[in-house]
Amino acid sequence: MNTRLVGSEMCIRDREGTDTNTSIGNYFSTMLDQSMNWKDAEKLCSQWGGHFALKGVMSVEDAKRAVDIGCTGIMVSNHGGRQLDGSRSPFDQLAEIVDAVGDKLDVICEGGIHRGTHMLKALSLGAKACSGGRLYLYALAAAGQAGVERALELYKSELVRDMKLMGCTKISDLNRNNLRFRR
């Protein structure tokens, strides 16, 4: 798959060797397969035979269903919800999902992680891990592997510094008492 800039729009060549171009917006709109269902996810999970994390969980109901089909992890993610004005962020959902299933599988906060303090907040809410794509991709595009390594160093140094400022010496010290919630 190739990308190129046509006018002011980024285009993706659909297949190698063809001249069919698709805008980035159209590509991501069409790659969302709404025919996938819970039976498909359960089949994938059972056939995988190992740890299996389901991405895109944004409700307690779906988190419980992921447990029921045998997932060992979930990624609380709104799949680029920045394109859906007013949608809840993974941070908004995280605490209630962790409360419901956090003792049964690993809850990973995916999305909205742009700095170490975001990781600190997600881990304090009970996430076992954090995931993010844009910072990694920006760093990769700007400086290759060295850029990604530097971005990860920045994440780590911010997290360690801010944990020290909070009086926490290890990740397991993080909890919701470390956070102040807006009312």
Question: What is each PLM-predicted segment?
Answer:
Residues L44, A66, I74, A122, ...:
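Conserved, mostly hydrophobic/aromatic
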Residues S35, L54-V60, S87, L105-M119:
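Glycine-rich beta-to-alpha transition loops that act as phosphate-gripper elements at the mouths
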Residues Y27-M36, H51-M58, S77, D85-G86:
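Catalytic beta/alpha-barrel core
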